[in-house]
Amino acid sequence: MSVTIALLISLIAQTPAAPASADEAAVRDVVKQYVDARDRSDESAIRALFTDDADQLTSSGEWRKGRENVVRGTLGSSKANPGSRTITIETVRFPAPGLAIADGRYEIAGGPEGARKMWTSFVMARSNAGWRITAIRNMLPAPPAASPK
């Protein structure tokens, strides 16, 4: 009886295993591939990173729906907003099997208006072809609140 209780307690106390570090590395690599493909304006490489139903909500409020709109918008945005893009992923979470959320900082440096510093979130789904981007959300930080007088 005590062995059964001890076994039950140990099963209940166990936390779910963390996803393999290989998955986290793969998710981070997809983000790197995305930045590299944008830098090269490589339409085919960008397209290959997204699911068919992908969407992207930009920092300007444009909502691109569907892979082809995301690809066109990404290339157009890179042309309209020149500069060196850097995405630094700070956290990767796996809220469900085959689903990843990568959050980080997004900076466009060297543009005519100086550096743009934003936040970004990538949602990815695992498929037979590996991890693919299903959604991107880019956000500008809110300005600091005014001091009370």
Say what each PLM segment does.
Residues 2-5, 9-52, 68, 134, ...:
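Short, low-complexity N-terminal intrinsically disordered segments enriched in polar/charged residues
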Residues 27, 83-85, 131:
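Proline-centered linker/hinge motifs at extracellular inter-domain junctions
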Residues 45, 55, 100-101, 132:
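General beta-strand recognition
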Residues 50, 60, 91-93, 104-106, ...:
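A mature extracytoplasmic/lumenal domain signature
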Residues 54-65, 76-80:
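A short gly/proline-enriched turn/hairpin at secondary-structure junctions
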Residues 69-116:
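Surface-exposed, charged secondary-structure patches
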Residues 117-144:
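Short beta-strand edge/turn micro-motifs at domain boundaries
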